[in-house]
Amino acid sequence: MTEIIDGKALAQKLQLHLANKVEQMKEKHGLVPGLVVILVGDNPASQVYVRNKERSAIKAGFKSETICLSDSISEEELIEIIEGYNQDPSFHGILVQLPLPAHINDKKIILAIDPHKDVDGFHPMNTGHLWSGRSMMVPCTPAGIMEMLSAYHVDLEGKHAVIIGRSNIVGKPMAQLLLEKNATVTLTHSRTKHLSEVTRCADVLIVAIGQGNFVTEEFVKEGAVVIDVGMNRDKNGKLIGDVNFDHVAQKASLITPVPGGVGPMTITMLLEQTYQAALRSVTK
């Protein structure tokens, strides 16, 4: 029988535990973890994500600040704002919401963030730490998926994990985290030939390509664990994943829904990494 992974319930449980840790930090060190989220422009999806992050941060007892900037801001002005938060000891996490307007180079912006405050885990220094097995800040979605797999007692050792999507945000860091758990990893992408033949070999299938209902039951072997990272809208405006949930759930042993699966865990790991950054600031 298929079990649905309840990412929302798990996230709530972990955030409650995190709130207790924050309270202990206040009592022991007189310190409150600080997170600033910088939003450029008025992308509706980004606005929703940012509101959810701020709401969760405040609920967990964090100092939370959201900076909303015009999409006409220059690259230099944005970097200057980031530099200010790099120097501010009351903020331990800095997140610049992507995507950015076309005239701003997102690589330059990521480089401008202090790696010790880069709670998205996108700075090249943190990427290097991840691939050398000494990770400090890890991209939040892969980190959240690993937490989910652990909570649902998915043993990864020796298992074949297939990832659809090779982005720097999900696919590539996901591969490294799975390798660290001794899984055998196949990273597929838009140029992979005979994709469904590859994915049917997967004990664990992670899908992050941004195409609604792309993965159907023919991509999945019986009893596989299926993690859907996709967030898409169908023609009626309904939120759907990259996986055709109704069809694939008939074959999977474990599957994440959309919404209520990976998304809440991404925010949870963002908060956890901000907390850890704050903790390092008083224990270094």
Swiss-Prot record:
Record-linked CDD domains: NAD_bind_m-THF_DH_Cyclohyd
Q: Which Gene Ontology BP annotations are present? A: L-histidine biosynthetic process; methionine biosynthetic process; purine nucleotide biosynthetic process; tetrahydrofolate interconversion
Could you tell me the EC number(s) of this protein? 1.5.1.5, 3.5.4.9
Please list the disulfide bridges: none
List the record's Gene Ontology CC terms alphabetically: cytosol
Q: Name one Pfam family in it.
A: THF_DHG_CYH_C
Q: Which residues bind NADP(+)?
A: 165-167, 190
Q: Which GO terms describe its molecular function?
A: methenyltetrahydrofolate cyclohydrolase activity; methylenetetrahydrofolate dehydrogenase (NADP+) activity
Superkingdom in the source lineage: Bacteria
Provide this UniProt record's keywords sorted from A to Z: Amino-acid biosynthesis, Histidine biosynthesis, Hydrolase, Methionine biosynthesis, Multifunctional enzyme, NADP, One-carbon metabolism, Oxidoreductase, Purine biosynthesis
Which reactions are catalysed by this chain? (6R)-5,10-methylene-5,6,7,8-tetrahydrofolate + NADP(+) = (6R)-5,10-methenyltetrahydrofolate + NADPH; (6R)-5,10-methenyltetrahydrofolate + H2O = (6R)-10-formyltetrahydrofolate + H(+)
The record ties this protein, via SUPFAM superfamilies, to: Aminoacid dehydrogenase-like, N-terminal domain (SSF53223), NAD(P)-binding Rossmann-fold domains (SSF51735)
Q: In which pathway does it act?
A: One-carbon metabolism; tetrahydrofolate interconversion
**How does this polypeptide assemble, per the annotation?**
Homodimer.
Biological role stated in the UniProt entry: Catalyzes the oxidation of 5,10-methylenetetrahydrofolate to 5,10-methenyltetrahydrofolate and then the hydrolysis of 5,10-methenyltetrahydrofolate to 10-formyltetrahydrofolate.
Q: Which family does it belong to?
A: Belongs to the tetrahydrofolate dehydrogenase/cyclohydrolase family.
Protein name in the entry = Bifunctional protein FolD
Traced from the root, the source organism's taxonomic lineage reads:
Bacteria, Bacillati, Bacillota, Bacilli, Lactobacillales
